[in-house]
Structure formats: structure tokens, C-alpha cells
A protein has these predicted regions:
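Adenosine-phosphate binding glycine-rich loop
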Residues: 13, 115-141
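ADP-ribose/adenylate-binding Rossmann-like module
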Residues: 73-77, 84-110
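Catalytic, metal-anchored helix/loop core of enzyme active sites in primary metabolism
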Residues: 5, 78, 99, 105-106, ...
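Residue-level detector of alpha-helix initiation sites
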Residues: 25-27, 82, 128
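Conserved SAM/SAH-binding loop
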Residues: 61-65
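Short glycine-rich, flexible loops that bind phosphorylated cofactors or substrates
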Residues: 66, 82-84
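Hydrophobic, well-ordered beta-alpha structural blocks that scaffold small-molecule cofactor pockets
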Residues: 2-60
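Alpha-helix C-terminal capping/helix-to-coil transition sites in glycosyltransferase folds
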Residues: 69-71
Length: 141
């Protein structure tokens, strides 16, 4: 449960779908890598990107509402709560699924820790409370 909400576990086909990540730091990098692993068409928006940031379409600028047009889902992973809240509001107006890296309680979705074994995918979620614990559980063989 996130903030008292039980979240519905679901597997989404994002192959070829536009997914936008706002942010250019470590958290955004992890989210981008996860989306790429599942075949998403990723656009990242940030005035600055950390060294080694994945090679995706980059909008090197401050966020604006037009950046999420036609997105299937959006992840707000900036280090600025106000910007993340603006992204949330813009996504909600457009009926776009949105995840706030700093506010799982108000997010439409969270990305669980997942491991693929051929045709089997195992996902573990602590509902945003302890991503490190979910990662440890996922790594149990």
C-alpha cells in the first residue's frame, strides 16, 4: 500500500511507446535504463545530464508542459519538488500516467524491482517504502 492505497500489480507493454523522464541525475538514469530495457521510446528532459546518462532523445532545457505531449507515461525524477508537482499536474490534465520519484503516495504507478528469467518475470515491490529491500529480495536465488 502506498499512503493507504493498495496498488494494482500490472505488466504494461511499453515497447515503442513514448515515455518521458524529467531529470538528468542518478534517479532519472535508473528509470531511463529500466524503460529502455522494456523497449520504450524514451525522451529525457533536463537542463543538465550527468556523465554517462543513457543515449536517448534529450531535451537539454527546463521542463515545459509541451514536453509530455503524446506520452504514454511520465516519470518526474528531478531534484525539485515544485517542478515534479508541475509535471504531475500537467500529466493529470492530459490523463497521462505519472510517477513522482519523491512522492509515491500521489503517483499513479511505481516501478517495482524486477528480474527476468527467460519467460518468467519476478517483480518485488515494497510499495515505495524501501526500494533497497525490494532489490535485495529480488536478488535472492
Amino acid at each position: 500500500m502506498v499512503g493507504g492505497k493498495l496498488m494494482f500489480p500490472i505488466m504494461l507493454n511499453i515497447r515503442g511507446r513514448k515515455c518521458t523522464v524529467a531529470g538528468g541525475g542518478n534517479v532519472a538514469e535508473r528509470k531511463v535504463k529500466t524503460l529502455l530495457k522494456y523497449g520504450a521510446d524514451v525522451t529525457a528532459v533536463s537542463p543538465v545530464f550527468k556523465d554517462g546518462f543513457p543515449n536517448v532523445k534529450r531535451l537539454e532545457k527546463e521542463y515545459s508542459s509541451s514536453d509530455i505531449e503524446n506520452s504514454f507515461l511520465v516519470i518526474a525524477a528531478t531534484d525539485n519538488k515544485e517542478v515534479n508537482q508541475t509535471i504531475y499536474n500537467d500529466a493529470k490534465k492530459r490523463n497521462i500516467l505519472v510517477s513522482l520519484s519523491d512522492d509515491t503516495e500521489h503517483s499513479d504507478f511505481i516501478l517495482p524491482s524486477s528480474k527476468n528469467y527467460d519467460d518468467i518475470t519476478i517483480s518485488v515491490s515494497t510499495n515505495g517504502k524501501s526500494p533497497a529491500l525490494a532489490k535485495k529480495i529480488r536478488q535472492i536465488k
